[in-house]
């Protein structure tokens, strides 16, 4: 707050549309992606699903396991890695608990597809990190602020998710993700411009 005037920043155009009619002008600022997040020359696994997130019902681990079991009926060699959970009921499911950033990066660089079945997310940084690494994402249609090219599937619709995943595993979809607007240097520059505008506005 400056001189009793608020300067509101949100992470997506969707939240801007929701809030502006209630509180006035809102500025959109993207989450930044760490410069260490880069694609790798290592060949990706052919049948490897990945779910990254804390162990919370909103993140959809149980749903992800249900979907993976069904996908394995078509692709028996499928392997699945999940963070957040520390025990696994299946030999094909690697429950990794909490992991270091270096291991997360390795998973993003080698997995086949990232699952984001969450009930809710703001602007999920893990999606931006995955796309920056060249890893395609399938996400719940409840998540509104997703980059163009992300595969969407209906929330908690097992059959729809299985169909979309199997289709991708059969015929991977190429996508172009413009990473520059999510780089830290660019976001820092945008914050500088925003602060300058706020100060200049108050000086008028």
Regions found by a protein language model. Give the residues of each.
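Conserved donor-binding/catalytic core segment of Leloir-type glycosyltransferases
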Residues: 33, 41-59, 65-68
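Donor nucleotide-sugar binding/catalytic pocket of nucleotide-sugar-dependent glycosyltransferases
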Residues: 1-38
